[in-house]
A protein has these predicted regions:
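Surface-exposed, charge/polar-rich loops and edge strands
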Residues: 1-360
Length: 360
């Protein structure tokens, strides 16, 4: 019944998820333009007991993947404008995806997918709460996308709720995944209204400690469609040698005319400096979004250049999350697709109804 977040499911894969179960979450998160139909489906599942309301609860979520483990907290997070510097964005957004998600929110009044946030948890004591809860038997276990294994624990003890609140009340959080959905949730909350503590002023959130050893961020490589000459780099013999040479450095690999190079960059974050020092100079006033292709597979980037889809590929190492957080705290936004947090939390575990008449 679970599925990846709505924006990482290709249209061609929708029938596959729909065929898994008549109750797969894509029937809610990817209804096409039938937003009212998604609302009817959600209410029908409630009426038939397919979905069961919990008492006020938080949840601990664990995902195992590739021999690693990550633990998260799922809870309602108060929506606050970026200017309050509590919720920190690190990427710009586009209008189109927000219009689609806002229409779905208006129809359903339900937070259907958790937004993913990262927090600095070393001094909060929250991770200790998560560890204690996860020693119990989980309420739910299931297999998720990409071979992931998941466990879910329910926290219904008001004393633990208070402890979690105390641990996080002075913390800022970084949006890991869901910039468009967060801004949509803000717009919806303003439309619906309600007092400051009403459910409509919150969103469903999955929160991960920045120091969790299972928190993984992957690089996204770029292929430039415009004609470009890249010079001055260190020559490399292969893709593997290029990727190894940029690991842990503020540098970018390049591929053009069957030649690999490494470009040293000056600054804190390679993806920022690649755009500022190289790509922006090539494109001038032209929008990068019109001239860039993105992939997490460096070999695919090489194929695109060899096939003439693009003229040059740029390879990046995974960004340092501490630097990403620092730049977000300074109010700086990064280029599009600077981070790819992995594996993304599946949709369909927990839903949160945005009732303006219900106080939290």
């Amino acid at each position: 019944v679970v599925a990846p977040p709505y924006d990482v499911i290709p249209d061609a894969a929708l029938p596959t998820y729909e065929a898994l179960s008549p109750y797969n979450v894509v029937r809610l998160t990817r209804p096409g333009r039938d937003y009212d139909g998604a609302a009817r489906t959600f209410n029908d599942w409630l009426d038939r007991g397919i979905l069961e309301p919990d008492p006020p609860s938080m949840y601990v979520h664990e995902v195992r993947f590739d021999g690693k483990r990550r633990r998260d907290l799922i809870a309602a997070l108060r929506l606050q404008p970026y200017d309050d510097r509590v919720v920190l964005p690190h990427e710009r957004t586009h209008r189109g995806p927000k219009e689609d998600r806002l229409a779905l929110l208006r129809a359903t009044n339900v937070s259907l997918e958790p937004l993913w946030f990262v927090y600095e948890g070393r001094a909060t004591g929250l991770q200790q709460i998560v560890e204690v809860v996860s020693r119990r038997n989980p309420a739910v276990t299931f297999n998720g996308p990409e071979g992931t294994e998941h466990r879910l624990w329910v926290i219904s003890d008001p004393a633990l709720h208070a402890a979690v609140h105390a641990a996080l009340e002075t913390q800022s959080v970084l949006i890991a995944d869901g910039h468009h959905r967060y801004e949509t949730a803000l717009a919806h909350a303003d439309e619906v209204g309600g007092d400051p503590d009403s459910a409509s002023r919150f969103t469903l959130a999955l929160l991960t400690d920045l120091e969790d050893p299972g928190l993984e961020v992957l690089p996204t490589h770029r292929v430039l469609k415009a004609g470009v000459a890249v010079t001055g780099g260190e020559e490399k013999q292969s893709l593997d040698e290029t990727l190894e040479a940029i690991r842990g450095r503020v540098a970018a690999g390049t591929y053009r005319d069957h030649r690999f190079q490494v470009l040293p960059l000056e600054g804190e974050l390679a993806v920022v400096e690649l755009h500022r020092q190289v790509i922006d100079n090539i494109l001038g006033k032209r929008s990068p979004e019109d001239f860039l292709l993105y992939t997490r597979d460096p070999a695919e980037a090489v194929r695109w250049v060899d096939d003439g889809v693009g003229s040059a590929a740029f390879f990046l190492d995974a960004p340092d999350l501490h630097v990403v957080l620092k730049q977000a705290q300074e109010g700086k936004t990064l280029p599009q697709k600077s981070t790819y947090f992995h594996p993304k939390p599946p949709s369909g575990m927990v839903f949160f109804r945005l009732d303006p008449n219900r106080s939290l």
